[in-house]
Amino acid sequence: MKMYKLMLGLVLAGLVSLSAQAIEQRDYHKEVIGKDCKSCHDQGVKNYPSDQACLQCHDVDELAEETARSEEDKWQNPHNNLHYGKELPCIECHGEHEAKKPICSNCHTFKYDKHKE
């Protein structure tokens, strides 16, 4: 019985520890920390946010301007690129609770030094 209680205690302690670590948030979203999860998770807390949720705070035209490159590399802009224009879903490159690589890196080798995972 003592062994059972010990094992149960260890399992419960592990679960509490995991749940505390499970919700990771990026520093650049400090202003939304503490708000209701539904402010971003507009399709339910178990689903990814829609682009409309991201666009409540972020403007795609401003992002495209901020990430613009020189003329010869202008289509290497993650927010206005040759393949998707400005239509690529935000979650393809960005994740709030876990790091993500830009979708471009699946085929291309150019880097985005300021990429926020």
Swiss-Prot record:
Binding site for heme c 2: H29, C54, C57, H58
Location (main, coarse): periplasm
InterPro entries reported for this sequence: Multihaem_cyt_sf, Tetrahaem_cytochrome
GO cellular component terms, A-Z: periplasmic space
KW Metal-binding (keyword) present: yes
pH dependence: Optimum pH is 7.5.
Annotated GO MF terms: metal ion binding; oxidoreductase activity
Cofactors, names only: heme c
Signal peptide: 1-22
Binding site for heme c 1: C37, C40, H41, H97
Protein residues bound to heme c 4: H83, C104, C107, H108
Reported induction: Part of the ard operon, which is induced under anaerobic conditions. Expression is further induced by acrylate and methacrylate. Not induced under aerobic conditions.
Matches recorded under PROSITE patterns: MULTIHEME_CYTC
Subcellular location(s) of the protein: Periplasm
Top EC category: oxidoreductase
Residues in coiled coil: none
Residues involved in heme c 3 binding: H79, C90, C93, H94
Regulation: Methacrylate acts as a competitive inhibitor of the acrylate reductase activity and suppresses the reductase activity in dose-dependent manner.
Subunit structure of this chain's protein: The ArdAB flavocytochrome c is composed of a FAD-containing subunit (ArdA) and a heme c-containing subunit (ArdB).
Name of the molecule in the record: Acrylate reductase cytochrome subunit
Native source organism of the sequence: Shewanella woodyi (strain ATCC 51908 / MS32)
